[in-house]
Amino acid sequence: MQTANEIRRTFLDFFEKNGHTVVNSSPLVPRNDPTLMFTNAGMVQFKNVFTGIEKRDYVRAASSQKCVRAGGKHNDLDNVGYTARHHTFFEMLGNFSFGDYFKDLAIEHAWNLITKDFGIDKSRLLVTVYHDDDQAADAWKKIAGLPESRIIRIPTSDNFWAMGDTGPCGPCSEIFYDHGEHIFGGPPGSPDQDGDRFIEIWNLVFMQFEQVDKETRIPLPKPSIDTGMGLERLAALLQGKHDNYDVDLLRALIEASAEASNTDPDGPHKVSHRVVADHLRSSSFLIADGVLPSNEGRGYVLRRIMRRAMRHAHLMGCTEPLLHKLVPALTRQMGEAYPELVRANALITETLKLEETRFKVTLDKGLKLLDDEITRIGSGQKLAGEVAFKLYDTYGFPLDLTQDALKAKGIGVDTDGFASAMERQRAEARKAWAGSGDTATETVWFELREKLGASEFLGYDAEQAEGKIVALVENGKVVEAVHPGHQVAVIANQTPFYGESGGQMGDTGVITLGTPGTGGKATIAVTDTQKKLGDLIVHFGTVEGGPVAVGEDAHFAVESTRRDATRGHHSATHLLHAALRDILGDHVTQKGSQVGPDRLRFDFAHTKALSAEETRAVEAEVNRRIRLNAEVATKVMTPDDAIKAGAMALFGEKYGEEVRVVSMGDLSTELCGGTHANRTGDIGGFKIVAESAVASGVRRIEAVTGPAFLAWAQAQEDLLAKAADTLKAAPADLPARIAGLMDDRRKLERELAEVRKQLATGGGQGAATKTVNGITYAGKVLSGVPAKDLKGMADEIKKQIGSGIIALVSDADGKASIVVCVTEDLTSKHSAVDLVRIGSEALGGKGGGGRPDMAQAGGPDASAAQAAVDRIEQALGG
């Protein structure tokens, strides 16, 4: 029996032998495609190749692409665990032709692979074609020898694929396997086609048209091929199984789940084991590709998947977190094919454990609420949307988790009611998914990149260089010349200026027209440099001294002081990354960075704030590595060779065919395209100035080095000297001096509060009151009294007068606050809430809130404090 790993290898080897380049799976987070939440097909990474935007040095490719379908248009989450072939994570095997071979060879490759290399019985195979695709039908007859009866023509969109409303499209042909008469189901196109007898195993898409608009479809000049075959389905067929969850890849995880939970893998918890196995795969691969659980976007989909698996672990009786214990089994099965699982092992394990530990706190309470509500639901009724929303909002139950929990009991959820409850809280809720990825780049950069090619960067070795201006852009348009005083974007054939990328800010400096010594007629003050489309370096600045034209020679000079400071900060981030991993653990991975001349910012995966001891240890370790003065060296190699050599890469980052590897002795080795110090000693000192949270599971460190460190230290000295001068104390005596002042302040605050209370209550003589319409009324303006003290003062007056109404207004800090207290015997006639609103309106406010016996409000007009007291008196009939 072939294992799934062997099947994947056979597929890729077959196409490699037939002239295809084997391309690694792209990350699950699509790059430069805001239309997709997750990579869900093999062709996603080739989309720009199919449309002609991107060109590669091969015209045939094959891949095994990791895919996730959960959330958005393609969402299989609800069915996972209950059916034989639904998954949130799966692998798609595919071969692709970009204007090279077409239908005949695509069909020949497919037929030879499945019947010869995989040995599938030809008599069990049948195919579909689009109803008018005679070319494909004839190819199947000629190449595979299939009779007309086993070539089914389908007139629907099931056999016509389109990338969107416009763009490449074409007919497709699907290969089906007949599992035999003992299984219910009819052939494709028949009324019983949804049965399990005939299962699609491979889809061949023939991209031969371009959809111009709704009415117009024209032939493509270079037709292409896009195929997709699910590895899990193919493995089930080749391993003699009719259920994807019985193939070795998933069965190993199911058995690991059963062992860890001490339950039968095929017993009452069969569905739960299947859910755990599938969701472990999708969760682990998403984390490895840089997605962390959160309450929005991709992170929320990950959280939904994880929490659904955690509920099923709970159903199996697990009282401790389960999922993280299964990561080793997953790594054994898939770590060789996908080394990112091995590299991210610690991060995956810790993230799963932390999320499950947190969710367990509310899971039991939420399930108890759900059980209580189920007992109240009558026959044919649904769970109220308000209850589903409470489970979501209070207990962290995604809606689909609640639906899944009710599925076995045959109970639905009032989703409209849930949506209404969600709408009411929209102002407080986080923004819903609005896409991700890079903003669509302006057309002008695409056109210039196509025309000019990549910019040559000289800045690794030089800060000054000669070049030629090859394009000018003003106000978003390509121009031939720009006049003095105008802002311009400049592209040169070569430049020492670094374009912002990889977290490193772009260079500034001066471009001088003409060659040095010839009296340059104009300059461009460069205020920023950016990279467009990955390798087009664009200088942004203002023209000075004379006009600038395309084709002119120019001298490019980077501002060296700023570049040096930036280089030091960039090299320090590498040392910081390594130190964090050494001190906190291998789960620490970079989540983002920003490097400039003034400071560095480094975001990393870690689940809790650093203690003062950890912060000091990290800082000391970075400084130790700086003092070793190791040489900073760079090499250019393939990403695979770099990672094999021990270089750290960013999970989910897309790298080209060659990468720069920056090593600092044996202190740090990372893939990086930025500029760096020559030796670690050039960085100077390193100081952490801030540590904070960015998102769940992501921390941020801000630090300074070199001249920025010196400036920071001098600023701290100035602050210390100023504080010492203000307090008339030596800097060393400041802690004791401040502690003494704080004690004095607390003592004075207590005394002041007592004085205010005495003033409010009449200084021991009783509060000043008047009788209004038979009611004792104590109304008073208290200047400078904090709003938080008003309720306590009102309670004191209430004790004195026994029965009555109190209104106290404070005008502290230019704002007015008002408290109204009504004794219990009067609340049936007068409400404190109604009276406080009258006072608030006088203060320019908009009402207030509280109880019938005590309410509080405020307003911006402190000058109307007495008017507020008088208005309430008038309302009582005074």
Curated annotation (Swiss-Prot):
Bias regions of kind Low complexity — which residues? 855-864
Q: Which cofactor does it need?
A: Zn(2+)
Q: Which residues bind Zn(2+)?
A: 570, 574, 672, 676
Instruction: Show the GO cellular component annotation of the record.
Output: cytosol
Q: Which UniProt keywords apply?
A: Aminoacyl-tRNA synthetase, ATP-binding, Cytoplasm, Ligase, Metal-binding, Nucleotide-binding, Protein biosynthesis, RNA-binding, tRNA-binding, Zinc
The record's section on InterPro entries has:
aa-tRNA-synth_II/BPL/LPL, Ala-tRNA-lgiase_IIc, Ala-tRNA-ligase_IIc_anticod-bd, Ala-tRNA-synth_IIc_core, Ala-tRNA-synth_IIc_N, Ala-tRNA_ligase, Ala_tRNA_ligase_euk/bac, DHHA1_dom
Q: EC number(s) on record?
A: 6.1.1.7
Q: List the catalysed reactions.
A: tRNA(Ala) + L-alanine + ATP = L-alanyl-tRNA(Ala) + AMP + diphosphate
Compartments it resides in: Cytoplasm
Q: Which GO terms describe its molecular function?
A: alanine-tRNA ligase activity; aminoacyl-tRNA deacylase activity; ATP binding; tRNA binding; zinc ion binding
Q: What is its main location?
A: cytoplasm
What broad class of enzyme is this? ligase
Taxonomically, the superkingdom here is Bacteria
Please give the residue ranges the record annotates as the region Disordered. Answer: 844-864
- What SMART domains does this protein map onto? tRNA_SAD
Function statement: Catalyzes the attachment of alanine to tRNA(Ala) in a two-step reaction: alanine is first activated by ATP to form Ala-AMP and then transferred to the acceptor end of tRNA(Ala). Also edits incorrectly charged Ser-tRNA(Ala) and Gly-tRNA(Ala) via its editing domain.
Q: What is the UniProt domain comment for this protein?
A: Consists of three domains; the N-terminal catalytic domain, the editing domain and the C-terminal C-Ala domain. The editing domain removes incorrectly charged amino acids, while the C-Ala domain, along with tRNA(Ala), serves as a bridge to cooperatively bring together the editing and aminoacylation centers thus stimulating deacylation of misacylated tRNAs.
The record's similarity note reads:
Belongs to the class-II aminoacyl-tRNA synthetase family.
Q: What is this protein called?
A: Alanine--tRNA ligase
Which species is this UniProt entry from?
A: Paramagnetospirillum magneticum (strain ATCC 700264 / AMB-1)
Report which gene this protein is encoded by. Answer: alaS
